[in-house]
UniProtKB/Swiss-Prot annotation:
Cited PANTHER family: 60S RIBOSOMAL PROTEIN L24, RIBOSOME BIOGENESIS PROTEIN RLP24-RELATED
Subunit structure, as described in the record: Associated with nucleolar and cytoplasmic pre-60S particles. At the end of biogenesis it dissociates from cytoplasmic pre-60S particles and is likely to be exchanged for its ribosomal homolog, RPL24.
Protein function: Involved in the biogenesis of the 60S ribosomal subunit. Ensures the docking of NOG1 to pre-60S particles. Activates and recruits ATPase AFG2 to cytoplasmic pre-60S ribosomal particles.
Regions of compositional bias (Acidic residues) in chain numbering: 154-177
Region (Disordered): 147-180
Protein name (database record): Ribosome biogenesis protein RLP24
Amino acid sequence: MRVYACHFCSSPCYPGHGIMFVRNDAKEFRFCRSKCHKAFKQRRNPRKLRWTKAFRKAAGKELAVDSTLTFAQRRNVPVRYNRELVATTLKAMSRIEEIRQRRERAFYKNRMKGNNERDFLRDKALVESNPELLRLREVELARQAAKEEAIEQASDEEMDIESEAESEVESESEAEEQLQKQKILLKNKRKNSKRIAF
């Protein structure tokens, strides 16, 4: 099974997928999807379309010149089967893939190195040249005032609820004390009435 690269965007064309165009001179052009086929028929330049691998490599966004990439070239000359050769090739393939991924990560990290500083300086220059960007608009001020009022009302309501709860507790305790006093008085009256009767 061979996985071909799309002639236009260089993404993989798996078996049973995509379109193949064969020119009069028997040259084969494989496309991963109809988007690439249409662009090819319109004679679009892949280096000028930002979503193609050709653009990314030409613009320096991806690793273009590296020894690990030479291993991925097509070899149409068949080699006589040799078990040891196949074993060493499979080992080498996994090792080369690891090295390529490591180099790509390093390339990306190096490319993105100064972005934070650049963005900060650009934003700073923008704010310095347009100070009105930092000024709050009337609508935002009104919203802020409304939020503050809502917070104050909520805190006032909480205070009212707490004070009501405290007053209820106090009134309950007073009512209990009055009941106890009444009970004591009733007991005293009974004792006195008994004494009087005898």
